[in-house]
Every structure is written in C-alpha cells, then in structure tokens.
Amino acid sequence: MRSAEWGRVLSLRTPHSELRTQTLSGDYSSLFSGAYEHSVDDKGRTVIPARFRQKLGEKFVMTRGLHGCLWVFPERTWSGVQQKLMPKSLLDDRGIKLERYFLGAASECAPDRQGRVAIPPMLMAHAGIKSGESVWVVGLTDKVEIWSRARWDEFNESLTDEIIAGLGREAEMPQYG
C-alpha cells in the first residue's frame, strides 16, 4: 500500500485513532504487520522477529494490552502513549485507573543477541503465557502484540465475516477494489 493510502487509513475515526495518530511518526515504513509463531523458553523468553526488532529499535516498552494480550511499543513512541494516558487531574479516577493499568505494568525491554526478550512474570500471567508453550507475535500498525496461542486461536475463532464487516463499517473503513 502506498503512503498516501496509509495516510487515509490512519486518519479514520476509531476509538483509538487519537492515540494512534499522535504516536505515528508519518513514516509509514515503520508500521508493523504480520504474525509469527514462536515458543517461550523455560526462562520466559520469546523471539521478537527480526523484522519487528528493526522497527522497535534497541529498547522498547512492553505492557498489558486489551483482550488478554501484551502490547509492545517502540521507545520513541512510548512517551506519546504516556501523555495520552495521563489523567486530566489528580482526582480523575477513571484516568488514574487507565494510567495504573497500562503504565503501572510497563516494562522496558531489550532483546538479547538471539533476538529474545524476557517477558516479566506479571505480564506472562496477564496474557496467559506459560514457559514451553507457543505465542503469536503480531504486528498491529503502531505496536506489536504478544498472544498466548490459546487466546490468539480463541480470539480468531470468535470473528466471523459479518463481525469484521460490521467493525469496518463502524470504523468507516474506505472501500477498496
């Protein structure tokens, strides 16, 4: 897809579009896509695909994601995510809960020479990831997700063509063809 088309797609109004457009740099070659299956070793490490490591940089931030997965952000975009999650005031209970959920669980990570990254125990528990099992490492535009195989399969099995079409209409996705 050409950059102009990505710009059109990224300017859509979705529940998370404000956060996303603030964290993307405008260089669409840095966007993530694709899914890779890897195993988790007995030390809680998994491989981040080379293609993703290149875009994530030397250091990145891993935190809780929605739907029982983990989110991994490039360090260069993490400050934008943090700013968007800041509560409006010290008394903003909802904002504080969001901040606590995502920022409180955040962990700075760096891959080793084999491209493996250690998943902190708290994040493994959140995502249902266990040593010796498979995970899916999924590129999702401005971030990478890490899913336990069981949750990834369950999530995908729950989606039908009708659900996807409905979500596309709600997000006002442009028609291509």
PLM region spans:
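Flexible "stalk/tail and boundary" regions
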Residues: 1-38, 42, 52-114, 121-177
